Amino acid sequence: MQTGHPADGVYFGLMSGTSMDGVDGIAVRFEAGKPPAVLSEAFVGFADTLRDALFALQQPGDDEIEREALAANALAARYAVCCHELLRTAGLSPDDVRALGVHGQTVRHRPERGYTRQLNNAALLAELTRIDVIADFRSRDVAAGGQGAPLVPAFHATVFGSPDETRVVCNLGGISNITILPAGGGPQGEGHARNDTVRGHDCGPANALIDAWVERHLKQPFDDGGRFAARGKVDETLLAALLDEPYFRQNAPKSTGRDLFNADWLDAKLAGFQHLAPENVQATLTALTAATVADEIARHAGDCRAVYVCGGGARNPVLLDALATALAARGLDAAVATTAALGVPPQQVESLAFAWLAYRFNARAPGNVSTVTGAAGERVLGALYPR
């Protein structure tokens, strides 16, 4: 008697987020009816030259096509290094891996114009790894009228749902987003999300601005432990000015990125606040992230009893404390913890999600949640580049 699913097997997931500091990779075994089994993980950093090129491509400029193509090749090379490290540490050969799901590097996200661009040379990546590559997950959702983001809520529902309580999974990456998992879902090892009840959307800036400010003033890539923010004091007048942004008033479904929330946006908002000490601005940016996330949870998940955080912000205790305070100020009795409390380390969640999306592609099963993205319906996401 045949058991399992034809798509079962080992998958790799690669995720390079809006921090653009490197790529997180994971090797995981998926079997129908069972939770994901992580085999190994790896992180490969980006050289400053690549990071600078990626940041430059966030905004329109001269000779974009040439610069974009060269950056895509450089990205594929770093992604391949990450894959070879996963093979080595998991004791696998390329033939052991069913496929690798790769997000690519978002350089432009404009679903209102019908497109989103995640930079990557998937053909080169397949050539360098000799593994089937599944890429370009967001475009199909956008083609179906959706935002193309966030895409991880279906995975969140698969592994983090609860039969007893409404939960919110909050990703604090460059941009913050939430997934609302109403009570009654429950983890489902076979990977079928309760798409009729799952909701989620992008809230606003998180590490994109926090990191940019600390890098400008301390020449550090991120606010380690939130210590820079902890030295400062929130300026309520500046916070009000930052919150006066039309995106925060938009109804869901909605998504955003560095197209909007970047250093130029911040500098425009800081006009008239040049007297503030840098640490006070940092404290206020941290409060902005907490406030925008708490506002969206209060608006859409008032019965939430637990918020589980993943992404780089999960390593910032000052930000987590600010989020807990902001939730309480809005009358929510919701505990704040990281996804480690549910058995998945925060740094693994997004790379796991893209491995899972590759698994869903091979199963020819939907990967989006139309109630989250606003797409016309559920769609199989991704495009295959054979080994």
Swiss-Prot record:
Family the entry assigns: Belongs to the anhydro-N-acetylmuramic acid kinase family.
- State the Gene Ontology BP annotations: 1,6-anhydro-N-acetyl-beta-muramic acid catabolic process; amino sugar metabolic process; peptidoglycan turnover
Q: Specify the superkingdom.
A: Bacteria
* Protein name per its UniProtKB record: Anhydro-N-acetylmuramic acid kinase
Q: In which pathway does it act?
A: Amino-sugar metabolism; 1,6-anhydro-N-acetylmuramate degradation; Cell wall biogenesis; peptidoglycan recycling
- Gene of this entry: anmK
Which residue ranges traverse the bilayer?
none
Catalytic reactions of this protein: 1,6-anhydro-N-acetyl-beta-muramate + ATP + H2O = N-acetyl-D-muramate 6-phosphate + ADP + H(+)
- For the ligand (ATP), the binding residues are G17, T18, S19, M20, D21, G22, V23, D24
GO molecular function: any one? ATP binding
Annotated signal peptide: none
Q: Which UniProt keywords apply?
A: ATP-binding, Carbohydrate metabolism, Kinase, Nucleotide-binding, Transferase
The record describes the protein's role as:
Catalyzes the specific phosphorylation of 1,6-anhydro-N-acetylmuramic acid (anhMurNAc) with the simultaneous cleavage of the 1,6-anhydro ring, generating MurNAc-6-P. Is required for the utilization of anhMurNAc either imported from the medium or derived from its own cell wall murein, and thus plays a role in cell wall recycling.
Cite the SUPFAM superfamilies for this sequence: Actin-like ATPase domain (SSF53067)
E.C. number(s) listed in UniProt: 2.7.1.170
Under which main EC class is this enzyme filed? transferase
